[in-house]
């Protein structure tokens, strides 16, 4: 295994500086991983990983942290990442799985599965914010990594666009909550709809605001969801909504499945 680099890279060196430094040290395939939906109280948690080509082939015009891009810009950059990445993978974790296993456990498992699903095996991994254990290659957790590493920014766009598309679908299936607008995050409109309608199956009952309106605030976090499936039972059997990982490739959407038995959307050059 190659020795991790000791090169000092300035945070203001540009979006590609960190990957270029790693590649100069011999790590040709640098993967970035990020997620979308941690702070939402409804909808899935989505993790993505991406490996961009070396040099100018890996430079994508307008690439940035997905949160800094307009919806139209995200869609354009998403298409560029899908077309030009050496490899990419997206994993979708349903809200019920987040309730059963816990947010951080699902976050780590989803990022780990996305990285393991890459068609091009990474030689070094960059993650946004916190490290991911259980990898066979060296890695680095980078604070605000989606703003300083191109591969992490690419992963953030993949995760964000995939999740936003799912929330638009859920808005049709569960009208009245405004999912297409706020994407499952807490807003005044969302809170008012929760109080008026109560939660739907796509809400995260382990979150205090959802548990409160459902009348289950006093129950332990993992016991708040009314219908609990077994940990080893695929989530498609629990009535989870279809419309997750395959849609971005123009394929028929697949049902969301559990961390232990998930299906990743894979692709690349």
Curated annotation (Swiss-Prot):
Instruction: Write down the PANTHER family for this protein, in alphabetical order.
Output: RIBONUCLEASE H2 SUBUNIT A (PTHR10954), RIBONUCLEASE HII (PTHR10954:SF18)
Where is a divalent metal cation bound in this sequence?
Answer: 34-35, 128
- Report whether Hydrolase shows up as a keyword of the record: yes
What's the cofactor? Mn(2+); Mg(2+)
Q: Give the cofactor note.
A: Manganese or magnesium. Binds 1 divalent metal ion per monomer in the absence of substrate. May bind a second metal ion after substrate binding.
Out of the domains of life, which is the source? Bacteria
- Give the signal peptide as a residue range, or say none if absent: none
Occurrences of domain RNase H type-2 (ranges): 28-222
What name appears for this protein in its UniProt entry?
Ribonuclease HII
Pfam families from the UniProt entry: RNase_HII
Which UniProt keyword terms apply here? Cytoplasm, Endonuclease, Hydrolase, Manganese, Metal-binding, Nuclease
Molecular function per GO: manganese ion binding; RNA binding; RNA-DNA hybrid ribonuclease activity
User: Which cellular compartments is it found in?
Assistant: Cytoplasm
Gene behind this protein: rnhB
EC numbers: 3.1.26.4
């Amino acid at each position: 295994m190659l020795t991790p680099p000791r090169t000092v890279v300035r945070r203001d060196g540009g979006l590609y500086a960190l990957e270029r430094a790693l590649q100069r040290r011999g790590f040709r395939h640098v993967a970035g991983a990020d997620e979308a939906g941690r702070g939402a109280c409804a909808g899935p948690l989505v993790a993505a990983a991406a490996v961009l080509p070396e040099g100018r082939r890996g430079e994508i015009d307008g690439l940035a942290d997905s949160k800094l891009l307009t919806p139209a810009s995200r869609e354009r950059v998403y298409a560029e990442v899908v077309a030009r990445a050496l490899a990419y993978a997206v994993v979708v974790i349903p809200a019920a799985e987040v309730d059963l296993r816990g947010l951080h456990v699902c976050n780590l498992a989803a990022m780990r599965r996305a990285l393991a699903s890459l068609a091009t095996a990474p030689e070094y991994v960059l993650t946004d914010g916190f490290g991911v254990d259980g990898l066979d290659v060296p890695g680095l957790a980078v604070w605000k990594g989606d703003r300083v590493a191109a591969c992490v920014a690419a992963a953030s766009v993949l995760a964000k666009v995939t999740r936003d598309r799912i929330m638009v679908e859920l808005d049709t299936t569960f009208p009245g909550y405004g999912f297409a607008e706020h994407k499952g995050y807490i807003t005044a409109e969302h809170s008012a709809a929760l109080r008026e309608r109560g939660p739907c199956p796509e809400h995260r009952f382990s979150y205090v605001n959802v548990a409160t309106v459902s009348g289950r605030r006093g129950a332990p976090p993992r016991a708040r969801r009314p219908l609990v499936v077994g940990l080893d039972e695929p989530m498609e059997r629990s009535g989870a909504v279809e419309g997750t990982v395959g849609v971005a490739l123009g394929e028929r959407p697949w049902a969301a499945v559990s961390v232990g038995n998930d299906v990743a959307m894979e692709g690349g050059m």
